[in-house]
Amino acid sequence: MEQEICAISFSGGQDSTTLAVWAKKRFKKVYLVGFDYAQKHSVELECAQKIASLLQLPYEIIPLDFLENITHSALFKNSNDLMGHSHAQNKDLPNSFVPNRNAIFITLLHSYAQKIGASNIALGVSQADFSGYPDCKEDFIKSIEHALNLGSNTAIKILTPLMFLNKAQEFQMAKDLGVLDLVIKETHTCYQGERKILHAYGYGCGECPACQLRKKGYEEFESNKK
């Protein structure tokens, strides 16, 4: 395994784009991997491709559209569920949650890391300022890292440098990395796939949970500068 290689789960959003720039400054080679799981906001894949080109990093998409056939989420293209309600399978979770999505992403990324000889994979997950998804928490990440390494006789590290950063701190991190303008104008967060309306914090409908979280973070980021 090469310490200089890192594989990243890359959606083209604020978190994973900031993460990609962070990794590019620390590793000799960085590979970006996106996942097409029949999400409503599939425009994020187009944004991811453009950002990967701007960062001059290799990027490939793994198709996972079968997920729509085996579980529920308001994020799926064919779902008529309105955002902001409880999940059909678990009332304690938001209906934007895709059951086991991160477990699947991480497992595939772990396999990909073995293929390219990477000893690190990186995720843009955070438990400090998140949408209520249990698979974004540190205890889950540590558990799946342990399980996957046991099951493959490897010692691949899962890096989560954003784990304890809120959205305001992520905007500050992007600024410190010199990519704040890129994050605002090129990344995509909106669950509705809105790319026509540019707000101070970026493109989006301004109403969905993802937009609200990003807006709140940007306003706090701006407030901290005063």
Swiss-Prot record:
Zn(2+) binds at C190, C205, C208, C211. Its EC number is 6.3.4.20. It catalyses: 7-carboxy-7-deazaguanine + NH4(+) + ATP = 7-cyano-7-deazaguanine + ADP + phosphate + H2O + H(+). One of its GO terms (molecular function) is ATP binding. Its cofactor is Zn(2+). It is an enzyme of class 6 (ligase). ATP binds at F10, S11, G12, G13, Q14, D15, S16, T17, T18, L19, A20. Binds 1 zinc ion per subunit. Pathway: Purine metabolism; 7-cyano-7-deazaguanine biosynthesis. GO terms for biological process: queuosine biosynthetic process. InterPro entries: QueC, Rossmann-like_a/b/a_fold. Keywords: ATP-binding, Ligase, Metal-binding, Nucleotide-binding, Queuosine biosynthesis, Zinc. It comes from the Bacteria. HAMAP family: QueC (MF_01633). Belongs to the QueC family. Catalyzes the ATP-dependent conversion of 7-carboxy-7-deazaguanine (CDG) to 7-cyano-7-deazaguanine (preQ(0)). NCBIfam families: 7-cyano-7-deazaguanine synthase QueC. This is 7-cyano-7-deazaguanine synthase. It comes from Helicobacter pylori (strain Shi470).
